């Protein structure tokens, strides 16, 4: 799968750039958030089951994941696109005020 190849490339690039972060992939969602699932599948990595950030292969995948976290888990989501000249705040028309504020705060942090 293309997304698995891209995740492996991101992992390799992160190691080459010597980032101050643990980056590992590809990981299925369960292996990203559950040490038990990762252990059953024999995945041995610091990130497995402990991921703080999840990268997704498309905006549609990310949208579905975030909506599930909001509506099933009570999460507050912040949306910001980085990589351009300035960060771009991304919100949903149905976002609560807390999520809108979190998105603005994330964009401000991304400015540095």
Model-flagged regions — what are they?
Residues 2-9, 41, 69-74, 104-108:
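Short, solvent-exposed amphipathic alpha-helical segments in soluble enzyme
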Residues 2-52:
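Active-site rim loops that border cofactor/substrate pockets in soluble metabolic enzymes
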Residues 37-84:
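A C-terminal functional module that forms or caps the active site or interfaces directly
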Residues 32-33, 62-67, 97-99:
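Short active-site-adjacent structural elements
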């Amino acid at each position: 799968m293309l997304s698995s190849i891209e995740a492996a490339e991101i992992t390799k690039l992160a190691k080459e750039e010597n980032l101050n972060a643990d980056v590992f992939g590809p990981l299925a969602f369960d292996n990203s958030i559950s040490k038990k699932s990762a252990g059953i599948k024999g995945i041995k990595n610091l990130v497995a089951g402990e991921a703080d950030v999840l990268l997704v292969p498309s905006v549609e995948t990310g949208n579905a994941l975030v909506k599930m976290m909001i509506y099933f888990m009570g999460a507050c989501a912040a949306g910001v696109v980085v990589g351009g000249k300035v960060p771009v705040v991304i919100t949903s028309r149905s976002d609560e005020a807390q999520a809108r504020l979190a998105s603005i705060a994330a964009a401000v942090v991304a400015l540095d």
